[in-house]
């Protein structure tokens, strides 16, 4: 696996790559734009090229993340159109920066019902993948199940992907906190969980992992990340996940609560120590 964390690109993509390297990252994640909005700039070709060259020099892998505000299942036609345009730009920027994929949360049905939410998501994804013709895959992320969130179960993610017209352009990102809070695994049954995920085809489509502890207990359906070893997964639980070999070959990035990016350095080192 390639361990790392989330890095800001507010000072430019090349600087983000330098910051990731300085913190001891082997992989890093970045937001394509402000995570709370739809407005963003297209990637600067020169800066993107410099960043990609640095990534190659340092052996870094990058993962992009679309804004949290994106709702693939919105029933509002205007908001759907805005979301598609925004995600198209996210994918274009992710491709320019050399990211292995662009993460997007599963949709929220906002009271319209789960069946509607899934159908609307498929429609939105079809329109998006018709508009964006590049090579960067969209990585759908599992959710904790807060409110009307879809995508708590792996089977649901697989179903949505199977219904899309171009499923080969969609893969997955697995969040350890979300899945635990959704109640779909415990550390003590991790091996069985991964075996099931492999059996249904999900694990073979996994391209990135978010390594987070959980501030709330198993099945709480609350999306609140905790620092590694400080939540309900605990040190033993995080160690179980890391030592299992399930994340072999994948970028594994921390999205844990920090006041400053520099705090990620010791936490990445801590994660590596759990592999011993």
Swiss-Prot record:
What EC number(s) are associated with this protein in UniProt?
A: 3.1.21.2
Q: Which InterPro entries match?
A: AP_endonuc_2, AP_endonuc_F2_Zn_BS, Xyl_isomerase-like_sf, Xyl_isomerase-like_TIM-brl
Cross-referenced Pfam families, in alphabetical order? AP_endonuc_2
Q: Which UniProt keywords apply?
A: DNA damage, DNA repair, Endonuclease, Hydrolase, Metal-binding, Nuclease, Zinc
Q: Which domain of life is it from?
A: Bacteria
Question: What is an example of a GO molecular function annotated in this UniProt entry?
Answer: DNA binding
Residues given in the record as Zn(2+) 2 binding sites: 141, 175, 210, 255
Task: Tell me the cofactor note.
Answer: Binds 3 Zn(2+) ions.
NCBIfam families in alphabetical order:
nfo
**Biological role:** Endonuclease IV plays a role in DNA repair. It cleaves phosphodiester bonds at apurinic or apyrimidinic (AP) sites, generating a 3'-hydroxyl group and a 5'-terminal sugar phosphate.
This chain belongs to which protein, by name? Answer: Probable endonuclease 4
Q: Which organism is it from?
A: Symbiobacterium thermophilum (strain DSM 24528 / JCM 14929 / IAM 14863 / T)
């Amino acid at each position: 696996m390639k361990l790392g964390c989330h890095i800001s690109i507010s000072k430019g993509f090349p600087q983000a790559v330098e910051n990731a390297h300085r913190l001891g990252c082997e992989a890093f994640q970045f937001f394509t734009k402000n995570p709370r909005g739809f407005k963003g700039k297209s990637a600067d070709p020169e800066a993107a090229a410099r960043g990609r060259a640095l990534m190659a020099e340092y052996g870094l892998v990058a993962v992009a993340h679309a804004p949290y505000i994106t709702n693939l299942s919105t029933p509002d036609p205007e908001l759907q159109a805005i979301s598609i345009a925004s995600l198209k730009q996210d994918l274009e920027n992710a491709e320019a920066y050399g990211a292995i994929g662009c993460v997007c949360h599963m949709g929220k049905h906002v009271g319209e019902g789960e069946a509607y939410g899934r159908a609307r998501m498929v429609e939105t994804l079809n329109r998006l993948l018709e508009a964006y013709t590049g090579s960067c895959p969209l990585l759908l992320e599992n959710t904790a199940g807060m409110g009307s969130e879809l995508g708590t179960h792996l089977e649901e993610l697989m179903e949505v992907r199977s219904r899309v017209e171009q499923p080969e352009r969609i893969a997955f990102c697995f969040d350890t906190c979300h899945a635990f809070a959704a109640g779909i695994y415990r550390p003590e049954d991790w091996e069985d969980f991964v075996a099931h995920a492999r059996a249904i085809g999900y694990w073979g489509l996994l391209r990135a992992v978010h390594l987070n502890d959980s501030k709330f207990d198993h099945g709480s359906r609350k999306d609140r990340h905790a620092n590694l070893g400080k939540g309900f997964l605990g040190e033993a639980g995080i160690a179980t996940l890391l030592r299992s070999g399930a994340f072999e070959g994948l970028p594994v990035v921390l999205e844990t609560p920090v006041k400053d990016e520099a705090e990620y350095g010791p936490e990445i080192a801590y994660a590596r120590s759990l592999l011993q």
